[in-house]
Amino acid sequence: MMSNLIILPMLLPFVCALILVFTKNKNRISKILSITTMIVNTMISIALLIYVVNHKPITLDFGGWKAPFGIQFLGDSLSLLMVSVSSFVVTLIMAYGFGRGEKRVNRFHLPTFILLLTVGVIGSFLTSDLFNLYVMFEIMLLASFVLVTLGQSVEQLRAAIVYVVLNILGSWLLLLGIGMLYKTVGTLNFSHLAMRLNHMENNQTITMISLVFLVAFSSKAALVIFMWLPKAYAVLNTELAALFAALMTKVGAYALIRFFTLLFDHHPSVTHTLLVFMACITMIIGAFGVIAYKDIKKIAAYQVILSIGFIILGLGSHTISGVNGAIFYLANDIIVKTLLFFVIGSLVYMSGYRNYQYLSGLAKREPFFGVAFVVVIFAIGGVPPFSGFPGKVLIFQGAITNGNYIGLALMIVTSLIAMYSLFRVMFIMYFGDADGEQVQFRPLPIYRKGLLSVLVVVVLAMGIAAPVVLKVTEDATNLNMKEDVFQKNVNTHLKEVNHK
């Protein structure tokens, strides 16, 4: 029974998206249906996650064809944690955008494409074979291509061209890697791949193939290959920028974690050393970006890049603590970046400016923003007891265990830079003088303050209740880093491991 439910987190948004196609210009129906769907989706995802943590992973084989021959979905602690958090933030993002009451909310079927993007994201988390991962990536990317060009301004179209070109190249690389891996190993199912690759250690061909996947997923995660992200995020409206920041790069980071723990861990001196190097470069790029701009939307965009560096540094340590920290920080960052973009978007809404020098006096008029901003800053910086702290401590431990003191030092320094870049915005909000004309701030709608409050509470709760979340991330880490544990819990019928 539970195995059949695993399809629901992907099926419900898909069905809702189809229904919304026929509700054009019916604004109220669109809002109620889409938000209700995502609330139900979140509840189902959390229920499945609780079941998996207390029992064992669940799988669903379509058409009665068991793995490795049929299409399979896998619900383990890692995938369902990502699905639960993603469903939650999409619910808030939809409420944030659709609460405006504009008649334009259904223009271009905006909610439909948000739901289709969600289908691709959740499908990427749940699928248990490589080809379907590619299919889900394409669903996600096609929906995102539409969303990033909705405004039809010259600035948006320029950003969209870079975004589309780099992501198409990444998709080609992913398809190339899938073909190479299938030709070499003869299977695409994760469980079967893990079994066969475990018997192909020190195989240079596999190492080369793993590097193809590394580059492909790096283009999705903005790991070093980041050029598409700042321009694309800066031209999007608040809810779409929050959606992209919360989900798009995180799917790439999730894929890197899944592949370089469960599948490609046979030659860490090459693959994981390269991951650490790329993480360090990404942290440096992000740090320069957050202090180079006065545009608060671009500052937020580079914060996304910086956090990817933190996550991949933990993965690159190739240790239990490092990977555990990476998974925790990944889940946490989905929520924190949603809050960050909500705060930044609200500042732009109230002031009409993206340059933080025009925000003088805002915090005195809206004291609530001071609280929200402090929570964001400390969560990003990893200050205890905020939600960024447990993940960063575990990543620190992984770096120390691995002897990666340069990466550790970079993470500490760039974390401080990330905090500084936001503190200077906050300083202007409290104490700065308006640059030029006196800005007239318009009030933020109550419902948006309510959504910000929900995220603030959740970020605080993740820090205070970290042991609960760590139970989930520890289970995910052990399952994916220990091949024998994975095989005892997933697809136990796969006993034939000889490569034929």
Curated annotation (Swiss-Prot):
Cellular-component GO terms for this entry: plasma membrane
Highest taxon of source: Bacteria
Q: How does it sit in the membrane?
A: Multi-pass membrane protein
Q: TM spans, by residue?
A: 2-22, 32-52, 78-98, 108-128, 130-150, 161-181, 209-229, 240-260, 273-293, 308-328, 330-350, 368-388, 403-423, 450-470
Instruction: Give the GO terms filed under biological process for this record.
Output: ATP synthesis coupled electron transport
Entry annotated with the keyword Cytoplasm:
no
| Keywords assigned | Antiport, Cell membrane, Ion transport, Membrane, Transmembrane, Transmembrane helix, Transport
Localization annotation: Cell membrane
Molecular function terms, GO-annotated: antiporter activity; NADH dehydrogenase (ubiquinone) activity
Span of the signal peptide: none
Principal place of residence: membrane
Q: Does the keyword Cell inner membrane apply?
A: no
Which protein family is named in the record? Belongs to the CPA3 antiporters (TC 2.A.63) subunit D family.
Give the quaternary structure.
Answer: May form a heterooligomeric complex that consists of seven subunits: mnhA2, mnhB2, mnhC2, mnhD2, mnhE2, mnhF2 and mnhG2.
Q: What is this protein called?
A: Putative antiporter subunit mnhD2
Q: What is the protein's species of origin?
A: Staphylococcus epidermidis (strain ATCC 12228 / FDA PCI 1200)
